[in-house]
């Protein structure tokens, strides 16, 4: 039906007769001439109808936005004064000789100027996806998956599918359960990841595996989360953690070079401890120049319990955050930032405004100055590198609260004061995470997942001091987003059972949930390691959007609903009866 795409016509096509198929993006009726912007997935081209082709001109008078049409015509160069530099096809236009209206469109539920609520965009997603910027994002996503497949194939990885209907295993989030009709009362789970299957593939001898795969997690959503999402899933045998990182870094550098024309260079490597200490986050945004600086040793003897208490507490921390040019902040802005850090558990926000450093105490403005000597202030300013016109904010509490509060404040200030370089790419690897973290109930939970191997510890050493264990794990972070994470896996049965025990999984439960894995570990399991990238998040970064729903064709809302199909929906009673399921209505409060 077509010979060319609208958006691909150029000066090289001048004089050629072409047939185009697409939609009316905009129509301008000048009486004797009618112009339309005609759109398809590749872009927009201007088509015009003149009186010499009377039949086509008459039919064109009926055109309205989003009519689906076919046009045959001749490509012509535009006059110099009519060239549109903002359009890829702006140097040419098509003189139509014939027009076919394939399908008409009713009045549109979406605003023609694209000023629409997200609810409307999701309800009429098939119309929203016609917008050039949305089409471009999905085209970029397709390009990314194609580049990934070629790269992985060239590096000896095998694309192997793993099951969608599997067994529920604890991986940190709730499972989506699927009832079995044949085995009444039993349920499959949709996979949160192919984690165990890809490890079993390594045990099967496949050596290098990858898969672009759907995963499912029934968890509370955020702007960058979806209940179903896509992973670039990778596993290798006989490769060390640095070797895995080298290959995966090469993949990401390849993507950025091909999609953005940007060479990311070598990725720096930073430990979890350093990232938390300097940036208050395990996924630091290195485009932001501000860093947290420890000053507890300078404040142990001050007559100010807010500082002295945490400074003398082994579990406490006092840190300073220098804000270049921050002395310009008003009292209201400072109060607003003080309220902001309370979200993260901080009790408030002490500060020092540096007006004229050379004047010592007389050159600063601070509500805590009366508790500080000139020497202490000078030492703080020296350590933080403060200059005239800067602001120093303080965090004083337990280590987690200080890291969370100042880390979040750092990001907010970086954005609010334009200190973060939005035109820069800042990738890094974060390694050496704690193996376990406090579950808040007196026990431990795996920071990554229970199949991650510890660094340089035997099973007996791990059992003796689990809180000291460092995981042989690694995350890739770009511009403050965790885009991928992985680890070296446990390939020893004793170690795996030890980890399960530390996590409070008794032997009976181990056999019930992971018996197949424990059995497989008995038969010559190779050392193996892997990683998974979030394809949605990678695409989000590569297309420059901050909303993950913009890079998924048919996403869910933050309430995990599809407004277009109205899923989830109630099942009919016959289907429920066949499955042996009874829906229990929630009791109403009297």
UniProtKB/Swiss-Prot annotation:
Gene Ontology CC terms: cytoplasm
Pfam families xrefs: GAD, tRNA-synt_2, tRNA_anti-codon
Reaction it catalyzes: tRNA(Asp) + L-aspartate + ATP = L-aspartyl-tRNA(Asp) + AMP + diphosphate
GO molecular function: aspartate-tRNA ligase activity; ATP binding; nucleic acid binding
Localization of this protein: Cytoplasm
Annotated binding of ATP, by residue: 217-219, 226, 482, 534-537
Keyword annotations of the record: Aminoacyl-tRNA synthetase, ATP-binding, Cytoplasm, Ligase, Nucleotide-binding, Protein biosynthesis
UniProt keyword annotation of Cytoplasm present: yes
Enzyme class per UniProt: ligase
Binding site for L-aspartate: 171, 217, 448, 489
Region annotation (Aspartate) ranges: 195-198
Keyword ATP-binding applies: yes
Assigned EC number: 6.1.1.12
GO biological process, one term: aspartyl-tRNA aminoacylation
Family matches, as InterPro entries: Aa-tRNA-synt_II, aa-tRNA-synth_II, aa-tRNA-synth_II/BPL/LPL, Asp-tRNA-ligase_1, Asp-tRNA-ligase_1_N, Asp/Asn-tRNA-synth_IIb, AspRS_core, GAD-like_sf
Binding partners and assembly: Homodimer.
Function: Catalyzes the attachment of L-aspartate to tRNA(Asp) in a two-step reaction: L-aspartate is first activated by ATP to form Asp-AMP and then transferred to the acceptor end of tRNA(Asp).
Assigned protein family: Belongs to the class-II aminoacyl-tRNA synthetase family. Type 1 subfamily.
Name used for this protein in its record: Aspartate--tRNA ligase
Species: Salmonella agona (strain SL483)
């Amino acid at each position: 039906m077509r010979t060319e795409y609208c958006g691909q016509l150029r000066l090289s096509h001048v004089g050629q007769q072409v047939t185009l198929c697409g939609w009316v993006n905009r129509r301008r009726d000048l009486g004797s001439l009618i112009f339309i912007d005609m759109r398809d997935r590749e872009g927009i081209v201007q088509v015009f109808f003149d009186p010499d082709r009377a039949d086509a001109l008459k039919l064109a008078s009926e055109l309205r936005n989003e009519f689906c049409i076919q046009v045959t015509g001749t490509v012509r160069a535009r006059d110099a004064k009519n060239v549109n530099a903002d359009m890829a096809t702006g140097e040419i236009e098509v003189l139509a000789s014939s027009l076919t209206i394939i399908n008409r469109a009713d009045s549109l539920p979406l605003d023609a100027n694209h000023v629409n609520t997200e609810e409307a965009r999701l309800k009429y997603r098939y119309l929203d996806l016609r917008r050039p910027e949305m089409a471009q994002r999905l085209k970029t996503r397709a390009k990314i998956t194609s580049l990934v497949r070629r790269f992985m194939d060239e590096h000896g990885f095998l694309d192997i599918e793993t099951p969608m209907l599997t067994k529920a295993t604890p991986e940190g989030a709730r499972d989506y359960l699927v009832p079995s009709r044949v085995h009444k009362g039993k349920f499959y789970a949709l996979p949160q990841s192919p984690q165990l299957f890809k490890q079993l593939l390594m045990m099967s001898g496949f050596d290098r595996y990858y898969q672009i795969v759907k995963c499912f997690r029934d968890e509370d959503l955020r702007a960058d989360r979806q209940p179903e999402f896509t992973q670039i899933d990778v596993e290798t045998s006989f490769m060390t953690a640095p070797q895995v990182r080298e290959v995966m870094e090469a993949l990401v550098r390849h993507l950025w070079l091909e999609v953005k024309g940007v060479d990311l260079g070598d990725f720096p490597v930073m430990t979890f401890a350093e990232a938390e200490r300097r940036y208050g986050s395990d996924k630091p945004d290195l485009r932001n120049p501000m860093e947290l600086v420890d000053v507890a040793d300078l404040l142990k003897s001050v007559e100010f319990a807010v500082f002295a208490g945490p400074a003398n507490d082994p579990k406490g921390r006092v840190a300073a955050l220098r804000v270049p040019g921050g002395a310009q902040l008003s009292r209201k802005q400072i109060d607003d930032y003080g309220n902001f850090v309370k979200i993260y558990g901080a009790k408030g926000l002490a500060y020092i405004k540096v007006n004229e450093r050379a004047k010592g105490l007389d050159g600063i403005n601070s509500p805590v100055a009366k508790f500080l000597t000139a020497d202490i202030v000078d030492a703080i300013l020296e350590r933080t590198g403060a200059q005239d016109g800067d602001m120093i904010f303080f965090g004083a509490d337990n280590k987690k609260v200080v890291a969370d509060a100042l880390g979040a404040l750092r990001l907010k200030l970086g954005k609010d004061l334009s200190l973060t370089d939005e035109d820069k790419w800042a990738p890094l690897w974060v390694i050496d995470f704690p193996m376990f973290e406090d579950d808040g109930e007196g026990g431990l939970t795996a920071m990554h997942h229970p199949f991650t191997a510890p660094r340089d510890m035997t099973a007996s050493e791990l059992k003796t001091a689990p809180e000291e264990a460092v995981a042989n794990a690694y995350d890739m972070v770009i511009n403050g987003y965790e885009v991928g994470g992985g680890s070296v896996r446990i390939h020893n049965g004793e170690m795996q059972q030890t980890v399960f025990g530390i996590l409070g999984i008794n032997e009976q439960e181990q056999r019930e949930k992971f018996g197949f894995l424990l059995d497989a570990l008995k038969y010559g399991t190779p050392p193996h390691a892997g990683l998974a990238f979030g394809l949605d998040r990678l695409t989000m970064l590569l297309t420059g959007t901050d909303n993950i729903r913009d890079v998924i064709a048919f996403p869910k809302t933050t309430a995990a609903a599809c407004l277009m199909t109205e899923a989830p929906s109630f099942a009919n009673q016959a289907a429920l009866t066949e499955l042996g399921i009874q829906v229990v209505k929630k009791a109403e409060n009297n």
